[in-house]
Amino acid sequence: VYGNFLQPCHVLFLENGPERLNPMKRARIIYNPTSGRELFRRHLPEVLQKMEIAGYETSCHATTCEGDAVKAAEYAVEHKFDLVVAVGGDGTLNEVVSGIAKYPERPKVGLIPMGTTNDFARAVRIPRDINRAVDIIIKGESIPVDIGVMNDDRYLVNIAGGGRLTELTYEVPSKLKTVLGQLAYYLKGIEMIPSIRSSRVRIEYDGQVFDDKAMMFLIGLTNSVGGFEKLAPDASINDGKFTLLILKELNMAEFIRVASLALRGEHLSDPHVLYVKASKISVTSNERVLLNLDGEFGGILPATFENLERHIEMFVPLEYIKEKDRK
């Protein structure tokens, strides 16, 4: 299928193809060709065949630069696609959701995780296996999920944060992530340890205030942050609340101790950690504090975050829905 602003994408038709009586649904695959060590491109023909068999007339767009997936997703909304599939990491998913979030009528969203960390996919149990991820889209169920909006014009699907440590994910070059995967983050983290410092911040959350020095703050929508799934263990993807985690000022020995607790999910009762849930959060500082938005550079404070409850309809595994229902 070809179209304005579309990359060529061979669509495979069944025997009765375009003459079938039931109209086909329309899907748009938006993929980052550099994610996942460029594996997705090689699997594209079989993905298209699966989508066709499931009743989707499918077109593709390979992103070429930052912000490209936003425009591709906007195109999908304006041309009334039924489904948009994000293929890439958390940054690609963020751009796809950002492209559709402002519209009153939005297509459903599917995800094929091909990034380095894939926090959202981890949170809802979408596997990295391409064929299994496609099966979730065509055989699974969609549920409404929360997203966040920052300063009324930028969106987050998984995490926002500030502090030197949160700069790690967007300081690692894309080529290094392609070659080394998650190891690239560990190496960069070790390199950054000597430069970790606190900043004075004022954080207002649902009528409460934190006004003190902090090493970092994290505003989350899921339980997975940087690949660690125990930082916000009770996070829910559709309860209308962010999790807010503030790591207060501490020395390096204390930092290492709290970090080891966090790996085991035992950090929430530590006096150096403030952990709450809130639907609206405002953060200001007299210092220059950089922001991380779903693993990418998100600007500089001040910032206000608002939870848009159940705003996006996403396909997730049936097992995740059953697990969620049991809680």
Residue ranges and their predicted role:
Residues 2, 6-84, 208, 321, ...:
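ATP/NTP phosphate-donor binding region
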Residues 33, 87-89, 112-114:
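Glycine-rich beta-strand-to-loop/alpha-helix junction loops that act as flexible
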Residues 54, 63, 102-215:
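Catalytic core of DAGKc-family lipid kinases
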Residues 91-104:
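Short Gly/Thr/Asp-enriched flexible loops that form oxyanion-binding sites at enzyme active sites
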Residues 161, 165, 218-231, 297:
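Glycine-rich phosphate/pyrophosphate-binding beta-alpha loops
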Residues 176-184, 233-253:
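Gly/Ser/Thr-rich active-site loops/lids in small-molecule metabolic enzymes
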Residues 205, 211, 236, 246-327:
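ATP/nucleoside-binding phosphotransfer catalytic cores, i.e., glycine-rich phosphate-binding loops
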